[in-house]
Every structure is written in structure tokens, then in C-alpha cells.
């Protein structure tokens, strides 16, 4: 399950080998994603994509926009145009 940790400015996704993370800055209704991390042993298994799908659904539910400074987030949105409307 993906959860927002607003105090730490990140989303957290519990996985077998720890946590996958998506770091952001929030200002004026825009969430700027700066970095994502997936534990090294689990990379390449689609966990980052699963996390971003849930994260972007949450961003939409909050009525926010997105600036993808992290290349992974930018690529995810490009590959999943159903989230393109979230781009600021």
C-alpha cells in the first residue's frame, strides 16, 4: 500500500526489501517530484510503476498538479497518458 508521509515530503510503498519512495515538494497546488527510489534487489520488477500509479491517483484525488523533475516520473506519465492532465 502506498501512503503519503507529508511530514517527510514523500510517498512510501512497503515492499519485501524495504520501502520504495517518491520524494516531492508541494507549493501552490503543485507537487514537484524530485526523486524516486526502489530497493536495488527489487529494481526492474515494476514496483516503481505500481507506486507511481497509486501516487498519481492520490495526487488527482487531492486536486493537485504535477511537475516531474524526476526522469522516472516524467517517463511514467509519458507512457501512461491518462495522467497527462495532471501536468502543471
Regions found by a protein language model. Give the residues of each.
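Structural motif
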Residues: 5-7, 27
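A short, structured beta-strand/loop element
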Residues: 15-43
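Conserved functional loop/turn residues at catalytic and ligand-binding sites
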Residues: 37, 46, 63
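Conserved acetyl-CoA pyrophosphate-binding loop and the N-cap/start of the following alpha-helix
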Residues: 42, 46-51
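C-terminal structural segments of small proteins and small subunits
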Residues: 57-88
Amino acid at each position: 500500500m502506498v501512503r503519503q508521509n507529508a511530514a517527510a515530503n514523500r510517498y512510501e510503498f512497503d515492499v519485501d526489501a524495504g520501502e520504495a519512495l517518491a520524494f516531492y515538494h508541494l507549493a501552490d497546488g503543485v507537487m514537484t517530484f524530485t526523486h524516486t527510489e526502489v530497493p536495488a534487489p527489487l529494481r526492474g520488477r515494476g514496483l516503481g510503476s505500481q507506486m507511481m500509479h497509486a501516487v498519481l491517483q492520490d495526487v488527482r484525488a487531492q486536486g493537485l498538479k504535477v511537475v516531474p523533475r524526476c526522469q522516472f516520473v516524467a517517463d511514467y506519465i509519458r507512457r501512461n497518458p491518462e495522467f497527462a492532465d495532471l501536468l502543471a
